[in-house]
Each structure stands twice: as C-alpha cells, then as structure tokens.
Amino acid sequence: MSTESMIRDVELAEEALPKKMGGLQNSRRCLCLSLFSFLLVAGATTLFCLLNFGVIGPNKEEKFPNGLPLISSMAQTLTLRSSSQNSSDKPVAHVVANHQAEEQLEWLSQRANALLANGMDLKDNQLVVPADGLYLIYSQVLFKGQGCPDYVLLTHTVSRFAISYQEKVSLLSAIKSPCPKDTPEGAELKPWYEPMYLGGVFQLEKGDLLSAEVNLPKYLDITESGQVYFGVIAL
C-alpha cells in the first residue's frame, strides 16, 4: 500500500468518527427524552389516582345530614357546639299561632308540631329563657290581603326583654309593603301574599323574655298550620 493510500484512509476515518459520535449522542438524547416523558406521565397518573381516591390532599368537605356542605365558619361553629353536648337536654321551643284568635297574634304550645322542652316556658305570649347561653331564634309569618285600597306597610319583629337591664330591644325585624304607594283608582283588587322570615343567633341570659310580633295582625294568614311560628333552640 502506498503512502498516499494510507494517508487517504486515515483522513476518511477521521471524517467518519465525528458522524458516528454525533449519531451516538443523538441516540442518547432521544433515549433521555423518552425516559423523562415516561416518568412525567407516570408521575401525573399516580398523583391523579392518589387525589381521586383520597389518599392525599385536603380533607373532604363536611356535610349536613341532608347533604348540604358547611360553607360558612358560623355553621361549622354551631355544628361543633351542638355535637359537644347531648341535644336531648338543651332548651328548645317551637310555638304556633292560634288560628282561632281574631286580629291578634297569640302563640300556643299545646298544639301539634309545637313544643316546650328542657326548661323553656311560654308566659304572657313570650318565651322565657331558662339558662344563659347561645340561642338560635327564628320566626315566620304570612300576610295576605285583597287589593290595595290603602297603602299597607307590614312589620315583623322579634324582641328581647333583657332581665339584666329591664329594657325591651329589637333583635330582628323586617318591613315590607305588598302595595305600591300610588294605586290607580279603579284598579283590580287582586289577592296578594307576603311572607316574612327572621332568624339569628344571640347570647341570652336566664330569665330573658322573647316575643315575636306584627303591626297588622288582621292581615295574618293563620288558616293553615306551619305558616306562622316562633322558636328558640339552645346551641
């Protein structure tokens, strides 16, 4: 073999070596990318499974027995307070309107779906609080009428007569009018209905008196049970 041939072979070998090295590097790069993609997909799949089956992640949302979530801190607080005591020994009252009373709102406890328990009492149309504590107070009324010969303004109020300072104060109140201020003369006398619901949580003292009143009892619809009521629940 001549010297020129040997030199030519060496040059060809030097030219082929970078190509082989480049091909090897490309193969390694593809292998690394493939491995990284596989690990990424596997990790995401594993994380999804763990979250889906509740192995990791935040605690599941608490729910009421009827399936409604506890969406407020107040509801969570009330639930914790209620569960910390035996509900059977808590003061509770639910009174209903006397449908035989004419043009007045009289509360009765000796009726179906009404009760006084664990120290609660009804005296002079007022509920008597038996012990200091946090109480849920609620009341609903339903007004009805026929047409609007005059401007009608309806009010519904829950009040507390505090034993500590001997004064009656309003705890909850609502005002509504079923009629426009200006009723056209000769307008058709259409029937109307106006419900009002009040509810709130209050710190009460033993001996406090609670009352639920309306300004125009003649418009009350008390023909059906469950439409007008007043209640207190210790929390």
From Swiss-Prot:
It is found in: Cell membrane. One of its GO terms (biological process) is positive regulation of action potential. Glycans are attached at residues 83, 86. GO terms for cellular component: cell surface; external side of plasma membrane; extracellular region; extracellular space; membrane raft; neuronal cell body; phagocytic cup; plasma membrane. The record marks 34-35, 39-40, 49-52, 79-80 as: Cleavage. It is a single-pass type II membrane protein. A lipid is attached at residues 19-20 (N6-myristoyl lysine). The soluble form derives from the membrane form by proteolytic processing. The membrane-bound form is further proteolytically processed by SPPL2A or SPPL2B through regulated intramembrane proteolysis producing TNF intracellular domains (ICD1 and ICD2) released in the cytosol and TNF C-domain 1 and C-domain 2 secreted into the extracellular space. The membrane form, but not the soluble form, is phosphorylated on serine residues. Dephosphorylation of the membrane form occurs by binding to soluble TNFRSF1A/TNFR1. Disulfide bonds join 148-179. Its main location: membrane. Residues 1-35 are cytoplasmic. The modification Phosphoserine is found at residue 2. The keyword Disulfide bond applies. Residues 91-235 form the THD domain. Homotrimer. Interacts with SPPL2B. Cytokine that binds to TNFRSF1A/TNFR1 and TNFRSF1B/TNFBR. It is mainly secreted by macrophages and can induce cell death of certain tumor cell lines. It is potent pyrogen causing fever by direct action or by stimulation of interleukin-1 secretion and is implicated in the induction of cachexia, Under certain conditions it can stimulate cell proliferation and induce cell differentiation. Induces insulin resistance in adipocytes via inhibition of insulin-induced IRS1 tyrosine phosphorylation and insulin-induced glucose uptake. The TNF intracellular domain (ICD) form induces IL12 production in dendritic cells. PANTHER family: TUMOR NECROSIS FACTOR, TUMOR NECROSIS FACTOR FAMILY MEMBER. Belongs to the tumor necrosis factor family. This is Tumor necrosis factor. It comes from Rattus norvegicus (Rat). The gene is Tnf.
